[in-house]
Design a protein with these regions (language model features):
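General helical secondary-structure elements
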Residues: 341, 348, 382-383, 393
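Sequence-pattern detector for short linear motifs
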Residues: 7-8, 210, 389
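Short, surface-exposed patches at the edges or C-terminal ends of soluble domains, predominantly
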Residues: 21-358
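Cytoplasmic C-terminal tails of single-pass
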Residues: 389-398
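Single-pass membrane-anchoring alpha-helices
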Residues: 292, 359-390
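Short, Lys/Arg-rich N-terminal segment immediately upstream of the first membrane anchor
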Residues: 1-3, 358-360
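Hydrophobic secretory-pathway targeting helix
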Residues: 2-28
Length: 398
């Protein structure tokens, strides 16, 4: 039985590996949206340097047909709201499996507050917990800024998530990346309560880029959802904020990444390699980020299927052990039943002997009763014969 099980598992494993290897025989397609007011600043540099994927530009309404064949979708700081149909199309595409959606936001400075609202509507419609905070992240510390409090130098410090290859994001990165006038990331639970991802996490959350020694600015209403300026504002000390975060949907092997500023198209995108004298690892970070997404899309299905196979083998092994135990239990029950049957047979034989013995005894008793009855009849007869006859008085007188 063990040999058969190993053979079956081997065949299934080979089939899974072949399927997964062929599932992305074509290059990964990255689509960049420019149809919702996004700028294309630095996009040509990004596309020119990252050549291991196919690039596609979207300038029209987003529909299922437009997203057909797309593996990674970049929405770089859109300023025009997405329609309900577009949100549904993006959601259906994302949860079809093996997809990555990148959404970049803004701070609440100037028109950025409108972008925050529009993106949060998109995120809620898609079904992710991630949200943009309604505020700005600033610092007065010259070690984490590029000569202005709003030119934030942020740090690539991804969470180590086993099996999700997050180490790729930081490979070779030793310098900060620029986030010009950024917002930060928070998350919202099913009851509508907002949470601080620095202190509270949830299954599937991956924190990627951080701001340190910073504070919250509040430029336009409403006030920030999580980071009250009275606690996190200027003069309240140095604080940490999550600037890039992702939510991973393990059942679909899909990922959504939300950022407080964009890789491309904003005032000075994350691709920047230097800014106001600050040396940056922006290009390497962007390349690593896309490399991570490609790895997740192409290798994730194999990992997931191997995990499913391992679970199936464990379940099968458990079932076989249970069946073996049941067979052993049934064997013991059968042996006990055979013993009970033999015991009953012995009891029947004993009862039969007893009955036979009783039958002989009954026959003897019947003979004795008959003899006794005959003797009684004889005695009565003798007594009757011995009785004397009476003399007639009338005859004497005559």
């Amino acid at each position: 039985m063990n040999t058969k099980k190993i053979l079956i598992v081997s065949v299934v494993l080979v089939a899974i590996l072949v399927f997964a290897a062929n599932s992305h025989a074509q290059p990964i397609t990255v689509a960049v949206d420019l149809g919702h007011g996004e700028s294309n600043k630095y996009l040509s540099y990004i596309m020119g340097n990252i050549t291991g994927v196919q690039w596609r530009i979207i300038t029209t309404t987003i529909t299922p047909d437009v997203l057909k064949g797309v593996d990674i979708l970049l929405l770089g700081q859109p300023t025009v709201a997405f329609s309900p149909d577009e949100i549904q199309a993006i959601k259906d595409w994302l949860f079809s499996g093996n997809k990555v959606l990148y959404v970049a936001g803004d701070s609440d400075y100037g028109p950025g507050q409108k972008t925050i609202v529009q993106i949060n509507d998109l995120l809620a419609g898609i079904g992710t917990k991630l949200r943009l905070e309604h505020g700005s992240v600033y610092s007065d510390n010259p070690n984490v800024t590029a000569k202005a409090y709003y030119r934030m130098l942020t740090f690539v410090e991804p969470d180590n998530v086993p099996g999700l290859f997050t180490d790729i994001i930081k490979q070779g990165v030793t310098k900060p990346i620029l986030m010009h006038g950024p917002g930060c990331i928070i998350w919202q639970d099913a009851q509508g309560k907002y949470h601080d991802p620095v202190k509270e996490t949830f299954p599937g959350l991956i924190r990627i880029v951080w701001a340190h020694k910073a504070y919250i600015g509040d430029n336009t209403p409403p006030i920030p959802y999580v980071y009250d300026p009275m606690t996190y504002g200027k003069g309240t000390g140095d604080h940490d904020f999550v600037m890039y975060a992702a939510e991973y949907f393990s059942d679909k092997n899909s990922l959504i990444v939300v950022a407080g500023e964009s890789l491309y198209g904003d005032y000075e995108p994350a691709w920047a390699s230097s800014y106001y004298g600050a040396s940056l690892d922006g290009p390497l970070f962007v390349q690593n980020l896309i490399k991570w997404w490609v790895k997740l899309i192409t290798t994730g299905p194999i990992e997931r299927k191997l995990g499913d196979l391992s679970q199936s083998v464990s379940t099968l092994s458990g079932n076989l052990n249970q069946l073996s135990s049941q067979v052993s239990s049934q064997g013991s029950a059968i042996q006990k039943m055979q013993g009970d049957i033999q015991s009953i047979k012995n009891d029947v034989d004993s009862l039969k002997a007893t009955v036979n013995s009783l039958a002989g005894t009954v026959n003897e008793l019947m003979i004795l009763v008959i003899v006794e009855a005959v003797l009684i009849v004889v005695v009565l007869a003798l007594m009757f014969l011995r009785k004397p006859k009476a003399t007639s008085a009338t005859e004497v007188k005559k």
